């Protein structure tokens, strides 16, 4: 009998200025990051990941003690910085220069503050993905990418699951398109064995 090992990693997808005012979005980020740190104090094997360098910058500027806790957890490998972008942007309309600057500013920030850069792209809720993203991500030091939208109902022709995504210049990133929404009942405890391939 094959034993499967499943890793559950805490994550928070936040849209701090989509439907909230900036102050509300900031409050959600602060509360989420505080909760993640509290879980780490509670459970020694708890790991958390969050994207968007702008969130870390907000915490650094307004909650320096919390920021130092996050830096310590990143150094321990229990808090994983993700995304490599300043925020999760619209990935269809902006120019290549905009993406290049997203990557430059965020990766530079991560390196200065944490001594490392994000090594996987993370845009679960961005609508559409420019065909040049693999090239841009590669140049930004990112070799893997995770996304959800458009989901398989919105665009069933896109690959689902794990695949290699290639830009016209030949740059490739190992890509994972989430097979279900990050917020539906598929992730309920009752359905977890099915989702994880254990049933």
Where are these regions (language model features)?
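Catalytic-domain carbohydrate-binding cleft regions of carbohydrate-active enzymes
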Residues: 1-199
């Amino acid at each position: 009998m094959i034993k499967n090992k499943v890793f559950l990693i805490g994550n928070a997808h936040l849209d701090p200025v989509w439907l909230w005012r900036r102050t509300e979005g900031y409050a959600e980020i602060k509360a989420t990051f505080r909760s993640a740190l509290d879980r780490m104090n509670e459970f020694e094997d708890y790991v958390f990941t969050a994207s968007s360098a702008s969130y870390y910058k907000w915490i650094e500027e307004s909650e320096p003690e919390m920021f130092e806790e996050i830096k310590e957890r990143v150094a321990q490998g229990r808090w994983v910085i993700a995304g490599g972008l300043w925020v999760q942007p619209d990935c269809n309309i902006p120019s290549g220069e905009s993406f290049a600057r997203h990557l430059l500013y965020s990766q530079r920030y991560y390196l200065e503050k944490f001594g490392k850069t994000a090594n996987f792209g993370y845009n679960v809720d961005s609508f559409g993905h420019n065909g040049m993203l693999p090239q841009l991500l590669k140049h930004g030091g990112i070799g893997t990418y995770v996304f959800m939208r458009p989901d398989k109902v919105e665009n069933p022709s896109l690959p689902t699951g794990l695949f290699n995504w290639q830009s016209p210049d030949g740059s490739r990133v190992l890509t994972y398109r989430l097979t279900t929404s990050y917020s539906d009942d598929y992730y309920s405890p009752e359905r977890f064995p099915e989702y994880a391939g254990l049933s």
